[in-house]
């Protein structure tokens, strides 16, 4: 696999300390970790993560019962993370602008696309809405 993505409970909570332990010849080239709070994102970066996913930004059916991290965490990530990061969780066309305005330049979308009545159209809408975003 080119990319390996792990949740906090899959890595740190399971005793992992450095993503270097996951790297091997023929193994993943990029390793990312989920985070739900600034301390987890900081720990992921210190542990060698190539990227960090922050969320869920809003309530989402893919993580029922998990509290939303809010746009404040997106703002924190934009100001503090020096590795690529992705906003994820509950993103939709209705709230996308607020996520981008908070500083996100990369997003992950699941439900708003997979639950759409016209999946290709939903994908095109997200791509169109993201076309103005510039990475730093």
Question: Which stretches of residues belong to each language-model region?
Answer:
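A broad detector of short, well-ordered amphipathic alpha-helices
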Residues: 39-42, 75, 121
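Conserved alpha/beta-domain cores
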Residues: 1-10, 38, 45
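Histidine/lysine/aspartate-rich catalytic loop segments that bind and position anionic ligands
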Residues: 31-63
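Structural preference for beta-strand elements that scaffold enzyme active sites
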Residues: 2-3, 28-32, 51, 84-86, ...
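Hydrophobic/aromatic ligand-binding patch that stacks against planar heteroaromatic rings
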Residues: 43, 77, 98
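Alpha-helix-loop-beta-strand connector modules within alpha/beta enzyme cores
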Residues: 11, 16-37, 65-93, 126-136
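Glycine-rich phosphate-binding active-site loops on the catalytic face of alpha/beta enzymes
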Residues: 6-19, 53-65, 93-129
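Structural motif
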Residues: 26, 47, 80, 101-103
């Amino acid at each position: 696999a080119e990319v390996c993505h792990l949740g906090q409970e899959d890595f740190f909570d399971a005793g992992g300390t450095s993503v270097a332990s996951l790297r091997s010849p023929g193994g993943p080239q990029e390793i990312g970790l989920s985070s739900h709070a600034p301390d987890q994102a900081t720990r992921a970066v210190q542990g060698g993560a190539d990227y960090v996913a922050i969320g869920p930004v809003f309530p989402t059916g893919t993580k029922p019962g998990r509290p939303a991290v809010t746009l404040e965490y997106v703002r924190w990530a934009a100001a503090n993370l020096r590795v690529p990061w992705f906003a994820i969780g509950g993103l939709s066309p209705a709230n996308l602008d607020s996520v981008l305005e908070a500083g996100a330049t990369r997003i992950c979308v699941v439900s708003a696309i997979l639950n759409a009545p016209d999946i290709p159209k939903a994908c095109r809408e997200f791509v169109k809405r993201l076309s103005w975003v510039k990475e730093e």
